[in-house]
Amino acid sequence: MDWSQTLNLPKTDFPMRANLAQREPQFLKFWQENDIFKKMLEKNKNNKKFILHDGPPYANGDIHLGHALNKVLKDIVNKYKSLQGYYTPYIPGWDTHGLPIEQQVIKKLEVNRHEVDPVEFRKKCKEFALSYIDIQRQQFKRLGVFGEWENPYMTLDPKFEARQIRVFGEMAKKGYIYKGLKPVYWCPSCETALAEAEIEYQEDRTYSIYVKFEVIDDKGLFSNLPIGDKKVYIVIWTTTTWTLPGNLAIALNADFDYSLIDIGNEILVVASELVERVMKTNKIEQYKEIARFKGKDLEYVKCKHPFLDRTSLVILGEHVTLEAGTGCVHTAPGHGEEDFEVCQRYNIHVIVPVDNKGYLTKEAGKFAGLFYEDSNKEIAKELEASGHLLGVEKITHQYPHCWRCKNPVIFRATEQWFASVKGFRDQALKAVDDVKWVPEWGRDRIYNMIVDRQDWCISRQRIWGVPIPIFYCKNCRKELITDETIDYIAKIFEKEGSDAWFSKDVKELLPEGVKCPVCGCSEFEKETDIMDVWFDSGSSHAYVLESREDLEWPCDMYLEGNDQYRGWFQSSLLTAVATKGRAPYRIVLTHGFVVDGEGKKMSKSEGNVISPFDIINEFGADILRLWCVSADYTTDMRISKDIIKQLTEIYRKIRNTARFLLGNLYDFNPKTDKVGYENLKEIDKWALQRLYKLIEKVTKAYEEYDYNQVYHLVHNFCVIDMSNLYLDINKDRLYASKSESLDRRSAQTVMYEILIALTILIAPILSFTAEEIWQNIIFKEEDAESVFLTRWPSINEDILRDEALREKWDKIIEIKDIVSKQLEIARNEKLIGSSLDSKVKIFAKCDIKRFIEENKDIIQEVLIVSQLDVEESDSDQIKVEVYKADGSKCERCWKFDTMVGKNEESLNVCPRCYEVVKSK
């Protein structure tokens, strides 16, 4: 007889093989065609809001793994909050202005940006940006990320640009915007100023040089010293030889000691603490100190520039340290922030002997026309020939590079527009402390950055961006910016976009009758610079959160990579504090970078770049989503094919658990078949308690944004509590009991609860799989169209806190673990095959023996053995003996029983199976 026909074997359309890459698009279609995201919002529209404001990715290429990690983490936050009942509108955004797009368009059109019509050029830039928004939009949707994809925000949107102009106007009105000559990061390749957030540091090997500046006016300090006719030189040290044409001073520290060192034919001045190191580096063996002065004594000593007809004044500065060099700092106010500031105090004028493209100007004398990098060698040769080069040293140091073109940048003093951070620094620091930073070290990171940061250079010498809305009087050159002009321009931009600045005449951009407040002239010129793109994205909170009715300012969360402490987190904070006095966010959550399997940075040159679509097309988006939580995302995340393959195994275990549950619920309708708690079998009560513990821990982990903990909790529950224990134990009563028996319905009742809860718990992370499970649940108490339209599972506190139940089952599982080891030994010795082939005898001391006897049927069921005996022992340790089971094997349930075959029809089944078969 085919006994399988009499068993309740699992039935489900939920496939064992996931085939995610092929199946996921079906669910994307389902979500889109059924407006699931819209219905999620509708379901919670009257509830408390949770607003995550999207940091806009740059619209200039396919998405990379960093983008994928970022968007998936945001999606997890939003989906969890929505399932908890929060109203969670999510507006994706794009950063669309700036240098990278300009460069791509220049390359594509093969044009010179200085010669091209700006309006036509901007049109091409816009087309380029929009084309990549469409590409990235589809790529983000393929990840399973929910959002208002057809209604995103873009920094090129006319209304966005208008709001940005108003933010600028508000800051100007408060006196935070000014124009000044200051050294800024300058990219000669891109011919524009850069902000700190646009700088990347790379390790460079270079030469540092020691240069002698001859003292020509010692203020009489050295007149009584035994110097004779020997010349005195102050020795400076620099790693940027090309800046020497800009030298106007030598800075000393007022409190340091400086030694005059006789080296035989001349006298050198260096910081006393550094004498030995300087002499050793420059291979000077014979020397002696002849005098010592405080730095403040040497103030206003004059030196002769080594190759230009100019003097260099000795000045004092607190920035001078003894960490490297000579303690005498080469000072070129046109090439350094500290140099500039210290020279300002001495009224030393600024010269900048380097042009926009990085070539030395006539102020560099004979080196004019050389590219700054090429001048290093030529200047060093000149110094050596004239006897001013004391020595050369090869060093490795971190040097700033342009984040866009990757070329080295220079410090160069130019006229730029700045936002004065000084004016609201204290407010910004207070705002930092009002925010929750995850991880906590983020607070110190951004706090220290704001403490130390200089004023924000917001002007760029480019075309594709939002113009700085300022005019200049043609007569007296006074800047014009008023509430009236800002409002007028903003209204034009609202209708026509910022292209209007480039296409319209000045008079069309100004209200009628506007005159210069200084000289009364009515003729004006437009500012030609545009705003830093960080001002664009940094203003997004003002446009997105305030202009959409369903959002609110401030938002609940910003979530980006940890490079954004000096980028978007900071630019948003500064514009918000400057205009509103507080941060635009309540929580800031950060993640690390994506690196390869060995922890190395990904780069095309290394050949170790993995595209998100390499993973999606082979393994599916859910595997990529699982990777996003498979490690601590607040640090750098490793990825490789091997790592992904390991994750597919973990995914398979979760999927198989769901499949087993689905397969055994094909005939269970919770509306009619559910068993009340008081009638549940004890093992089912225990499983329910384990489920509630899981829900409690997973909920806490989601609340704390600890998604790696969610991953481990769910995986362990599926493998340890379910597959290895509860579901394995349940197979007999699920398959072999009467289909409608209390025994089977009890198991199904709890398995149904487990399936529903587990599906919802994984939905924020494994969104496609959770939806697939949900659609395969035949009968549901709550017939929600999608898993995302249901509610977060609740907990019965009484069951969860039932300590007697927990303690009892801890003991039972401890006994099972001991017995399982002995069964494994017996299996290896070929004494038994399946555990049902065995009879187990347990030897235990009195109290444990009594416990086993009182719960013998339960323990035998948990052990999955055919027979169980227990005997008393004096030992504190439980001893287990395994024997072949008594009786014959039931052909239906495979348990051994001495009563097999002893029935009216002489069927080779046990009494339980006979009763079931007979009833059918």
UniProtKB/Swiss-Prot annotation:
It is found in: Cytoplasm. Its EC number is 6.1.1.5. L-isoleucyl-5'-AMP binds at E560. It holds the Pfam family zf-FPG_IleRS. Belongs to the class-I aminoacyl-tRNA synthetase family. IleS type 1 subfamily. Its cofactor is Zn(2+). This is Isoleucine--tRNA ligase. It is an enzyme of class 6 (ligase). Keywords: Aminoacyl-tRNA synthetase, ATP-binding, Cytoplasm, Ligase, Metal-binding, Nucleotide-binding, Protein biosynthesis, Zinc. It comes from the Bacteria. Monomer. It catalyses: tRNA(Ile) + L-isoleucine + ATP = L-isoleucyl-tRNA(Ile) + AMP + diphosphate. Gene3D superfamilies: 1.10.730.20, HUPs (3.40.50.620), Ile-tRNA synthetase CP2 domain-like (1.10.10.830). The keyword ATP-binding applies. ATP binds at K604.
